[in-house]
Amino acid sequence: MNAIHCVGRTEPWQYVEDAPIPQIKDDEVLIEIKACGICGTDHSLHRGQEALFNSYDITFPAIFGHEFSGVIAELGANAPKNLEVGMRVTANPVLFDNTCPYCDKGMVNICDNRPFYGTDLPG
């Protein structure tokens, strides 16, 4: 798979043609990315803006990019039945645990334990 790696704060971005394809779990979906934006958050993290950088758990090399669209390439055994391989999709990059007080109130966007694709997790 192709990817843009950020190898370190303020280091040049690197284009990688042979990045490993993630292995999915039974309840996950693999999306073949067709388009991905690099937004202000990505640039701020790359520049090392302290307040923003310290709010994420970033390991380098990082694959930024949380604004994306693509097609479903693979479905886990327990993926939702309304999804199909080849379907065009986008996704919310925020994961949530459904156990914290915010999730209980439906405010999953501020979950206490929310990893984020493109920052905490590879984009």
Identify the residue ranges that each predicted region occupies.
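Short structural boundary motif marking the start of a folded domain
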Residues: 1-4
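Residue-level recognition of beta-strand termini and adjacent short loop/turns
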Residues: 8-10, 25
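Short N-terminal binding/cap micro-motifs at the start of the first secondary-structure element
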Residues: 10-15, 40-41
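Glycine-rich beta-strand-centered segment in the early N-terminal region that forms part
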Residues: 21-36, 51-101, 109, 120-121
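Short, solvent-exposed secondary-structure boundary/capping segments
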Residues: 43, 82, 111-114
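Short Gly/aromatic-enriched secondary-structure transition segments
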Residues: 45-51
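Cys/His-rich zinc-coordinating "finger/knuckle" motifs
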Residues: 46, 107-110, 118
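Cys/His-coordinated zinc-binding microdomains
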Residues: 104, 115
